[in-house]
């Protein structure tokens, strides 16, 4: 795990903000971000940024692991990373789990950021700008729908022909608090379209391998759309299941014990500064046991 916890002994009274700055050799703004995320503790108590400290403290910080390479393509202004399943694209609250942002910034520096995101459960390609400006320009491509994204998924049941799923998606606000991340098919939702193409079928497991092209970018769109046509993705615990099962799945996710979702962002195709790019990621090893011999 690239987040490490290290102990330091402070011999004379020192402001917490300055300590973090000096230890991590970062700016005051970056040091403040670490303190806001409650990463400095003394006697198991969170240290505030204005606090004067002395004695033994413990600091949690990201230490890049050079052996854990995920960069699959690099250009002058951006890179493309292959995110594993069950890793966040961005840091999540006060948690110290690895995120893809950590990997991106270990390669390109602190001004590098993802231009879009993948769900925690989904693996595959993520485009990242090397600077704030390039990230802004790349985000504009996604907003203007100038990036073609394709996914691979393993889904329950036989899909023997192409499907266009055109169902509006609503992200509700006034629902059970513990299930608030779940989107819904609703006439009040935003237009959402997903193209589904069958690639193969394993009759022994009753599982189809699908190529999926989302034409819109709603939260959990592919997962919700496939569940809505009775082809739930293998490993899906949030959609197409009863509320109690969804709650159990979310608890397992918090404990890092949730089943792996069989959804992979397989390719990105776009034009940027006069050049055409098509970047592909191979099918994940976790898919192989489900495929027909």
UniProtKB/Swiss-Prot annotation:
InterPro entries: PsdUridine_synth_cat_dom_sf, PsdUridine_synth_RluA-like_CS, PsdUridine_synth_RsuA/RluA, RluA_PseudoU_synthase. GO terms for biological process: enzyme-directed rRNA pseudouridine synthesis. It comes from Helicobacter pylori (strain J99 / ATCC 700824) (Campylobacter pylori J99). It catalyses: a uridine in RNA = a pseudouridine in RNA. This is Uncharacterized RNA pseudouridine synthase jhp_0321. PANTHER family: MITOCHONDRIAL RNA PSEUDOURIDINE SYNTHASE, RIBOSOMAL LARGE SUBUNIT PSEUDOURIDINE SYNTHASE D. Its EC number is 5.4.99.-. Belongs to the pseudouridine synthase RluA family. CDD domains: PseudoU_synth_RluA_like (cd02869). Keywords: Isomerase. Transmembrane segments: none annotated. GO terms for molecular function: catalytic activity, acting on RNA; pseudouridine synthase activity; RNA binding. The active site is at residue 119. It is an enzyme of class 5 (isomerase).
